[in-house]
């Protein structure tokens, strides 16, 4: 990356929406979901050890499904690729699989494929991924707001660990609000905003557990 690319990247970061700038990059920054990412939990240990198997995250919007995928992207030694099931076609999937096979064969490097809104893939698209999950060509991470037991291929389900994310608690939302208004690097800390307890309570109440 040359100086121009670096400056362009920094400019994009600074102009990104607040929610994007404040998205956690490490497990320690993630708020809530202690039932799956507490220090004694399987997912926490797997991410820390970089020993992941295929995973499906499901839960309401704003609970951290994509955030956890991004944390994995920031910590894993595997190649991290992603597709959105609402827009990805067969060609996109074939390109990912081709690259994954090359990396595994030439360098022994694994590939993690994150599929957002995986329930949007039709049966044929889900079936296409199955053999490559089975033979280890890819490690699949799917994210969905729907119950995967009804919306995702049963064979993919049987080869994945399912983690349910829950709506954030009011205290979690308040903690995120406080972080956003005090963080001087990524948040609004340089504006010296004072968010009193009543305002935090109100915002936490109307959020509905959606960060």
Region roles according to the model:
Residues 1-49:
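A short, basic N-terminal segment
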Residues 1-11, 45-83, 98-101, 130-135:
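Walker A/P-loop
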Residues 36-41, 78-112, 123:
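Short glycine-rich substrate-engagement loop in P-loop NTPases that contacts/grips substrate
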Residues 84-86, 161-174:
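Conserved AAA+ ATPase "SRH/arginine-finger" region at the nucleotide-binding site
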Residues 159, 175-189, 206:
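Conserved AAA+ ATPase "sensor/coupling" helix adjacent to the nucleotide-binding pocket
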Residues 189-206:
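Short conserved motifs of the RecA-like P-loop NTPase core
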Residues 207-211:
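The conserved phosphate-sensing helix
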